[in-house]
A protein has these predicted regions:
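Interfacial/capping segments of alpha-helical transmembrane domains
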Residues: 28-54, 98-99
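Short, highly charged, low-complexity non-transmembrane loops/tails of multi-pass membrane proteins
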Residues: 224-244
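Cytosolic juxtamembrane amphipathic/interface segments immediately preceding
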Residues: 1-10, 58, 62, 66, ...
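Individual transmembrane alpha-helix segments
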Residues: 63-92
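Membrane-interface capping segments at transmembrane-helix boundaries
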Residues: 214-227
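Membrane-interface segments at loop-to-transmembrane junctions
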Residues: 122-126, 157-169
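Extracellular/periplasmic helix-loop-helix junctions in multi-pass membrane proteins
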Residues: 183-201
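Alpha-helical transmembrane segments and their helix-start/interface "positive-inside/aromatic belt" motifs
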Residues: 4-22
Length: 244
């Protein structure tokens, strides 16, 4: 049910991913090419601390197992918030996406302005590809729920919300596992002594495997009629969900 539910929601989360990546790059380029903006927003001491110590040390300051658990919990909460808060017309979801864009874009811009763009990507890409994809899937699902409240179509609003909410629950459960994988990569691969190309390759392979899972197995399941909804006998009297 998870790959089918994520595949059916691709028309929401894929645009979310593309827009957010564009915003991150725009913020990063703007910050990286306008040092005076950085100096006006962030004290020079804080910039130096981030560039020389904090950004790199963040990934190795704690035992890997503890760090993986911490990262997994934090990312799961962010993803769950992005998804669940969609019920408030998607507005909190949009806010969480903006905060995420600012965090990534500004950090990248600051490191780029100080000649460490390579280090930024070397430490972000191994785990960040899968992690951000999971966040975008959660956010897209949340926005879909929010739009269902705004425009339920021919269904009653409560029925429409229930019909979209049940597959969203399957997405949420599946993302717990996805974020566990990204957390393990962040704790054990990102700070490892492996060459940069090897660490990024590992992250890319995992990301490609996830996308193949969604657009391969998920697509076939959706075409076979799987919606990500719970079994019919568990739906009470809710109307069936038609596959897109």
């Amino acid at each position: 049910t998870f790959p089918a539910a994520v595949y059916r929601g691709a028309r929401w989360w894929v645009p979310v991913a593309l827009v957010n990546i564009a915003v991150m790059f725009a913020l990063g380029i703007w910050m990286g090419t306008h040092p005076h903006v950085i100096s006006s927003l962030v004290p020079s001491g804080a910039v130096r601390q981030l560039v020389e110590h904090d950004f790199k040390n963040y990934y190795s300051a704690h035992p890997a197992t503890d760090f993986a658990a911490r990262v997994w919990t934090n990312n799961a909460l962010v993803a769950a918030g992005s998804l669940a808060l969609g019920i408030f017309l998607g507005l909190p979801t949009l806010y969480l996406l903006w905060v995420n864009c600012v965090n990534v874009g500004v950090s990248g811009g600051i490191l780029a302005a100080n000649g460490k763009l390579g280090e930024f990507f070397a430490l972000i890409l191994p785990h960040g590809m899968l992690e951000l994809t999971a966040v975008f899937v959660a956010a897209g699902t949340g926005l879909r729920i929010g739009w269902t409240i705004i425009d339920p179509g021919p269904r009653k609003r409560a029925d429409a919300l229930a019909a979209e909410g049940r597959p969203a629950f399957a997405v949420a459960l599946g993302l717990v596992g996805v974020l566990l994988v990204s957390g393990v990569i962040e704790a054990f691969v990102t700070p490892s002594p492996l060459p940069t190309w090897a660490r990024i390759t590992i992250g890319a392979i995992v990301e490609i495997a996830f996308l193949a899972y969604i657009f391969g197995l998920g697509r076939r399941a959706a075409r076979a009629g799987e919606t990500g909804d719970v079994d019919e006998w568990l739906r009470a009297d809710a109307p069936p969900v038609a596959a897109n």
